[in-house]
């Protein structure tokens, strides 16, 4: 289930297109039926808890897919950069699968961590390009709030650029294959 829950990638970015959700609907329904067929009567408590967790995750996915559709209605869904650790276990509200958690990086970056960050940053333009086609909803309040998220993300990108240029300019350009 958890492998299915991660969307497939298109041009390196998670695919949240209507076409992708339609294409995967049958597989989701099969997974749901498999879960529902399981007889948990004689299972241990911790195995039943696991079953309930997976069931709750599937219900959440289904609710997002059919009702909330944050990839259609909420520009903030496409916010990728998080400069600070959230005060909740995950992030508040729906979040995409391509987050760059800047606060998790220690500077100076090792070559591997610089490569990780570069890979995460390379996803951003493709995800935002996809957002242009996906965002067709009319949830005005989400659009108003989402604009602020992107102003903040722009500031975050400038901070990252300054920070990385100072400590890793040549290394990062090499990883991003820039002269």
Labelled PLM ranges:
Residues 1-179:
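N-terminal maturation segment of proteins
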